[in-house]
């Protein structure tokens, strides 16, 4: 089937009956206020063609999708072995905010897409940058072509006020010598990245570099080397959907990254990047209707990385 906005509209119509069966993230009070019936999808091709349906232009809180962007920024600042000495490359099989595995593995997080791993990446950014929050915003604005993108400070404050578990994770890593900076400062930068508001259109454009051998949309020089891009995609395929990464690979067959704001980005290297948004989550913390929409898209296009 040929990619078109009509195809995307038909996919959203097909998954719309799932609305009401999931649950909006309510442990972050500011996120609990997002209307549960929102549903949008955008696909950007490596040539820059854009196809959209539903609420594709409405900004939302990207949450853990930011972890892929933070890792990308870190990879532009550090030798890769400096990063992988402090965070692993393995799926966790545990909830994204688990302390148990971190204690067992002596403060080395399993991967950069669970909270502990993302906090290590934020710590690395804090060490190397004088203004990590601003640099992260500059990166997403440049990648998406949208200079108006901002972080929602109400959401960032809300997350910071409910950050005891993330603080515990950071202090545990500090106890094992795997955290360099002041915990409070790193947490604020971490939550600021999670609170960035982007639309499906923004995100589909922003992540094209991962589908295009490291080259961002409209650019000629790579942000990341092709080899590094391949490695990031491998991590997204194995670790990007919390402890549901295997099921997502089985059903959708694309590298992806989700966030509890209800967004999921996924990509087919050499072809396209897609972002879907529906705030209601399943038990693993991934968008319920969003996952179903991506499964249908992969099926209709007959595309998968496997």
Swiss-Prot record:
NCBIfam families: Gln_ase (TIGR03814), PRK00971.1-1 (NF002132), PRK00971.1-2 (NF002133). It catalyses: L-glutamine + H2O = L-glutamate + NH4(+). Transmembrane segments: none annotated. It holds the Pfam family Glutaminase. This is Glutaminase. One of its GO terms (biological process) is glutamine catabolic process. The keyword Hydrolase applies. PANTHER family: GLUTAMINASE. It is an enzyme of class 3 (hydrolase). Keywords: Hydrolase. Belongs to the glutaminase family.
């Amino acid at each position: 089937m040929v990619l078109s906005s009509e195809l995307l509209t038909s996919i959203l119509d097909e998954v719309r009956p799932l609305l009401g069966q999931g649950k909006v993230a309510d442990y972050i009070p500011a996120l609990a206020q997002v209307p549960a019936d929102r549903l949008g999808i955008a696909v950007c091709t490596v040539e820059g063609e854009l196809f959209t349906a539903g609420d594709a232009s409405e900004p939302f809180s990207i949450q853990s999708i930011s972890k892929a962007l933070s890792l990308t920024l870190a990879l532009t600042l550090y030798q890769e072995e400096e990063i992988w000495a402090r965070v692993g490359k393995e799926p966790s099989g545990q909830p994204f905010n688990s302390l148990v595995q971190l204690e067992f593995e002596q403060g080395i997080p399993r991967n950069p897409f669970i909270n502990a791993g993302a906090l290590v990446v934020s710590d690395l950014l804090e060490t190397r940058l004088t203004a990590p929050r601003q640099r992260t915003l500059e990166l997403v604005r440049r990648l998406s072509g949208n200079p108006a993108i901002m972080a929602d400070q109400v959401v960032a404050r809300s997350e910071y006020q409910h950050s005891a578990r993330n603080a515990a994770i950071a202090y545990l890593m500090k106890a094992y010598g795997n955290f360099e900076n002041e915990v409070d400062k790193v947490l604020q930068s971490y939550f600021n990245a999670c609170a960035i508001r982007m639309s499906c259109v923004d995100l589909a454009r922003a992540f094209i570099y991962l589908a295009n051998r490291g080259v961002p949309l409209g650019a000629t020089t790579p942000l990341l080397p092709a080899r590094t891009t391949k490695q990031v995609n491998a991590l997204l395929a194995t670790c990007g959907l919390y402890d549901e990464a295997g099921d997502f690979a089985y059903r959708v067959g694309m590298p992806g990254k989700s966030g509890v704001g209800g967004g999921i980005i996924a990509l087919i290297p050499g072809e396209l990047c897609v972002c879907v948004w529906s705030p209601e989550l399943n038990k693993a913390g991934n968008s319920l209707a969003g996952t179903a929409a991506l499964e249908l898209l992969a099926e209709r296009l007959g595309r998968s990385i496997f």
